Curated annotation (Swiss-Prot):
This is Soluble guanylate cyclase 88E. The gene is Gyc88E. Residues 739-766, 795-831, 842-861, 913-956, 1017-1048 are annotated as: Disordered. Belongs to the adenylyl cyclase class-4/guanylyl cyclase family. Gene3D superfamilies: 6.10.250.780, H-NOX domain (3.90.1520.10), Haem NO binding associated domain (3.30.450.260), Nucleotide cyclase (3.30.70.1230).
Length: 1097
């Protein structure tokens, strides 16, 4: 069955009963497609299925429904141009009825798989005729009656009465007899024309059979007497045989008998051979027997024509022509073009049809593709309409939205509800929370809370009215009236209080707190506004419910007297007493505590809600200690104080003496070997004591209780396995968001490229990149040495600046008598010679590894003069990094029972690597020396190189690496010059002492003598000096200098002394006898190089 009939049914229902009825019928019948394609084939029983369902839904009888659908069909086919075909089918109504079979034959060209019915007229009079209807389909009797009656009225302007005379079923064919009564005066005119005399012209049989090459002549016994020329070629055995044995009568649907054929001479007859004719011919090329689509053609010969009674012969002549859809059928039957008759268009139609078949096939394919696209578009449209309806129903109640769709005025949707229950809730201290967090965190928090509450509205069957800020409003009893509206709202309130405990306050870590108020009463509800319409509630009940919420307290459900009366006795209620309500006076209210046997919130994955992260997660730098790897999984980050309290008692924490740079330095670096001797808690205590900030460390899982306490911000976390929501915290959101940093400072705003320093909520400061820290340290060191060289060079060979101390040698840091190198105006820019030689520099990866110390940019001083007074460059003696005891002695020289914060006097934290050989001099490229920056640390130099914006990323990396390599090479060169000059100075001083003292005066080291041939200081002076040594970190005026040298003796070649140092105390004290401001310290002589250093520093 083609979709033309199904589309007729669909359009009839839509036009008469409406679109909604058709959609209802289609859904009940289980039909997914909203429309049908006219040329597509559908199941045979589909129309009957839809018709029966429509009769049930519409409440009409089968006869009325099918008859009216047939009447509608005549106007419906006019949309596709078939009304013109119907109008020219016959001059009179009787001609139309006699030509109905021919109409279906024409339509077969457009609908090749059509199973057309057969119509035969008989007993014709001027008052009407008898019509026989035969069809393979059942259930179309009344449908046919409506079509014929409408054709008579529409095209021939005649009123027709149709009577069903008989209906019978013969095998699979339905045979129905109609008696048609109408004005049939055209039949009288036709009878008069048949009675006129006709002159018979003689014609020979040879000419007749040549004009009709496929004709057949048979008598009353159905034996073939003669056949046409072309038929003689392909069926020569047919002559003299019964036609019923060789052919079947396909149309009309009557018995293949002589008398029956005489009564149906006005119809087109179609005969088909019983046996295939291709078996009689040997076709060599089998490819010619295939259609273009690969299917096999029909092998039987099909003839269509007219039956003419030859009165002189008393026989019937069948004037037929072969039905050939294409050339393939012609080849299959063994025929040729010249076998077709010349006087008609058989040959032209065959050739023209072949030429147009490709175009028609292409057009058909395009039409089918468009039809499929249209169906897909209709399906997508239905899906979008469904989603639109869902969105609309979330904003407006379904019953109200349907009324608006039907065109009702929005004001007409307002309705009075005698009793409803309204709930209001809001967050306690919401304004304060918003002031402590970012706007994105506020949005994320509200989204998480509202998502949970929206799920609870579905659980308790209440309607969400609106949300304003942190306020949430729901109602029960409207728009759907419900007798248990108070209980539903109370259950919603209890669920909201329970569910809010799973949401955390981002600013404090505690769970959010809400207050809830409920009141019951009468309201008016409806749609307000034309743009962005909303379903609103009006009445005093709304105001009272809002007052119940505003007078409630945190985590409590406050209900009124009217709500208490409506709920059952299974609710636990505590009387609050009378309170003053604004605008209401004194009211008696109650606390709703719990409901007996209330179902707990179940944990389901579909209802879990997670906050919206405002920014992509980025790692936030933390102040941390270098620790050995921990094999066990780590718990979430927690403050040190919380972790210590949760995991170990305070009395068990030993005091640790740690050497650090300053309290202003934000990080503590320990070597891996030394860190192995310290527990995680010890390192946390050390880091917290030195930085003054809460250092977060990862601790192994100690106990479930401790872990829960730490994760909950100190409060014990209750394991809510029965909840529908997993706990939601915003700690990670705040930690990952760079935009959430409350501090964002820029050091030196006048620089081309500002060094930005950010700190998170815990106060941890971090630089932009590690390479900048390293580059800053190298540039600061280089600048310091250049300043030192310029200052010392100005004192070289100057007799007026000689030290007044006769025991002090020549300043060891003097570079020589060479003139000082002029300092460039911008030391960070390469000279043209340096830029030309940059291509010859060694790649950065080949430079020797050097260890650097970093410090916070916020604590650096900008003044270079102050820097010269506060910075001391020291080379300390090398330590064996592989010996744990040696490192432990450096890091933790003593362990006492003093509290952790009582740190020993601050010392220089030195980290040095073991030199490759004993004979190597310190400071060479093979040995690495660490640089300690002491309190107060120097500010990063203003001469930091600006980022060359015109360079690519790779070029900038190469530029910075070349700069750092150049600085390291200059540092090595300067150290070598210093060592060389100092060696010369030591040799000169040794010769002078040898000339003065000879071998007496203290050169014996074994006897306790001074290696510099100097007498020891007075005992009293030494004791007083030791008593004035600073003992805590508060003695910040300490300034210390030192160099690592090999042992020396005046008898040997001049070498640097083992460990020479001096301390400078601004407060004065017991000093050396030769110079004010210098004294002995730690039992060592510290006057060797103070005289010239005093002038410099």
């Amino acid at each position: 069955m083609y979709g033309l009939l199904l589309e007729n049914l669909s359009e009839y229902i839509k036009s008469v009963y409406g679109e909604e009825k058709w959609e209802d019928i289609r859904r009940q019948a289980g039909i997914d497609s909203p429309s049908f394609s006219v040329h597509q084939v559908y199941p045979e029983n589909l129309l009957q299925k839809l018709a029966k369902k429509a009769q049930q839904v519409l409440g009409v009888s089968e006869r009325d429904f099918m008859d009216q659908m047939g009447v509608y069909f005549v106007g419906f086919v006019g949309q596709y141009g078939y009304d013109r075909v119907l109008s020219v089918l016959g001059r009179h109504m009787r001609d139309f009825l006699n030509g109905l079979d021919n109409l279906h034959e024409y339509l077969k060209f457009s609908y090749p798989r059509m199973r057309a019915p057969s119509f035969i007229c008989e007993n014709e009079t001027k008052q009407g005729l008898t019509l026989h209807y035969r069809s393979k389909r059942r259930g179309f009797v009344y449908y046919t009656m409506g079509q014929i009656r409408e054709v008579a009225r529409y095209f021939y302007h005649k009123e027709m009465h149709i009577e069903l005379v008989r209906e019978e079923i013969l095998f699979d064919t339905v045979h129905v007899t109609f008696q048609l009564t109408f004005d049939n005066r055209a039949f009288t005119l036709a009878s008069l024309a048949m009675t006129r005399e006709e002159k018979h012209l003689p014609i020979s049989a040879h000419v007749l059979f040549e004009i009709f090459p496929f004709c057949m002549v048979f008598g009353a016994d159905m034996v073939v007497r003669s056949i046409g020329n072309s038929l003689m070629v392909i069926l020569p055995e047919l002559l003299g045989k019964k036609i019923t044995a060789w052919f079947d009568l396909v149309r009309p649907l009557i018995a293949f008998k002589f008398q029956t054929i005489l009564n149906r001479t006005n119809n087109i007859f179609e005969l088909v051979t019983v046996d295939p004719v291709t078996e009689r011919f040997d076709v060599q090329n089998e490819d010619l027997l295939q259609h273009e689509d690969g299917s096999e053609p029909e092998k039987s010969l099909r003839l269509k024509g007219q039956m003419v009674y030859m009165e002189n012969w008393r026989m019937i002549m069948f004037l037929g022509t072969p039905v050939m859809p294409d050339l393939t059928s012609l080849i299959t039957t063994g025929l040729y073009i010249n076998d077709l008759s010349m006087h008609d268009f058989s040959r032209d139609l065959m050739l023209a049809g072949t030429q147009q078949s490709v175009e028609l096939k292409l057009a058909l394919d395009q039409e089918q593709q468009k039809s499929k696209k249209l169906e897909e578009s209709m399906r997508l449209l239905d899906e979008e309409m469904r989603r639109t309806d869902e969105l609309l129903y979330q904003m407006i109640p379904k019953q109200v939205a349907d009324r608006l769709r039907r065109g009702e005025n929005p004001i007409d949707t307002c309705e009075m509800f005698d009793s409803v229950s309204i709930l209001f809730s809001d967050i306690v201290t919401f304004t304060e929370i918003c002031s402590r967090i970012t706007p994105m965190e506020v949005v994320s928090m509200l989204n998480a809370m509202y998502s949970i509450f929206d799920k609870l509205t579905e659980r308790n069957s209440v309607y969400k009215v609106e949300t304003i800020g942190d306020a949430y409003m729901v109602v029960a009893g409207a728009p759907d009236k419900d007798a248990n509206h108070a209980e539903r709202v109370c259950d919603m309130a209890l669920d909201m209080v329970d569910a809010i405990t799973d949401l955390k306050d981002p600013s404090t870590g505690q769970h959010l707190r809400i207050r809830v108020g409920v009141h019951s009463g009468a309201v008016v509800a409806g749609i307000v506004g034309l743009k962005m319409p909303r379903y609103c509630l009006f009445g005093d009940t709304v105001n009272t419910a809002s007052r119940m919420e505003s007078t409630s307290i945190a985590m409590k459900v406050h209900i009124s007297e009217s709500t208490k009366v409506l709920i059952g006795p299974n609710y636990k209620i505590i009387e609050r007493g009378e309170i003053d309500v604004k605008g209401k006076g004194t009211m008696g209210t109650y606390w709703l505590e719990e409901r007996e046997n209330r179902l707990p919130l179940q944990l389901t994955a579909a209802l879990q809600v997670h906050p919206l992260s405002p920014v992509p997660p980025t790692p936030t730098p933390k102040t941390k200690a270098i620790m050995p790897p921990v094999s066990k999984p780590l718990t979430p980050m927690m403050p040190v104080s919380v972790s210590l309290a949760a995991s170990m008692p305070t009395s068990n924490v030993p005091a640790v003496d740690v050497m650090a740079s300053s309290s202003s330095i934000s990080g503590l670096a320990l070597t891996a070997a030394a860190a192995a001797h310290m527990s995680l808690h010890h390192q946390a205590v050390v880091a917290e004591a030195l930085t003054g900030a809460s250092v977060e460390v990862a601790l192994p899982s100690v106990a479930s209780g401790a872990t829960g306490a730490a994760a909950g911000g100190g409060a014990p976390s209750d394991d809510r396995n029965s909840r529908i929501y997993s706990p939601v915290t915003f700690k990670d959101v705040a930690r990952r968001s760079v935009a959430n940093s409350p501090v964002r400072s820029c050091a030196q705003p006048d620089q081309e490229r500002r060094r930005e320093s950010r700190s998170n909520s815990t106060g941890h400061v971090f630089m932009r990149t590690p390479s900048e820290i390293f580059g800053s340290l190298i540039l600061d060191t280089e600048e310091f040495l250049e300043d030192l060289q310029i200052s010392r060079s100005s004192l070289a060979n100057n007799n007026n600046n000689q030290s007044p101390c006769g025991f002090s040698p020549t300043p060891p840091f003097r570079i020589g008598s060479a003139p000082p190198k002029p300092r460039p105006s911008n030391p960070d820019k390469f000279t043209p010679e340096e830029l030309a030689a940059m291509d010859q520099l060694t790649p950065p990866s080949t430079a020797p590894a050097r260890e650097t110390a970093s410090c916070s940019s916020a604590s650096l001083d900008r003044d270079k003069a102050t820097k010269l007074k506060k910075i001391t460059f020291s080379n300390s003696s090398s330590l064996d990094a592989t010996t744990p005891t040696a490192l432990a002695a450096v890091v933790c020289p003593m362990r006492t029972k003093s509290p952790p914060m009582a740190v020993a006097p601050v010392m220089h934290m030195v980290q040095a690597s073991t030199s490759k050989g004993d004979g190597q001099r310190p400071g060479s490229k093979d040995s690495v020396s660490s640089i300690s920056l002491h309190s107060p640390p120097p500010h990063r130099s203003n001469s930091a190189p600006a980022r060359p914006h015109s360079m690519s990323k790779a070029a900038r990396k190469a530029f910075l690496a070349a700069k750092q390599t150049k600085a390291m090479e200059k540092l090595d060169k300067m150290i070598e010059e210093v060592q060389e000059v100092e060696s010369q100075s030591v040799a000169k001083a040794a010769n002078m002492r040898l000339a003065l003292y000879g071998h007496d005066g203290g050169g014996d080291l074994a006897a306790g003598g001074c290696p510099l041939f100097l007498p020891p200081p007075p005992q009293q002076q030494q004791q007083q000096q030791q008593s004035l040594m600073p003992s805590s970190i508060s003695d910040s005026g300490l300034c210390s200098h030192g160099h690592s040298h090999a042992p020396s003796c005046h008898h040997m070649d001049p070498k640097m002394t083992n460990s020479q140092s001096f301390q400078h105390s601004p407060r004065g004290g017991i000093t050396h006898q030769c110079c004010s401001g210098f004294g002995h310290g730690n039992g060592r002589h510290s006057h060797r190089m103070h005289s010239n250093a005093c002038r410099i520093l």
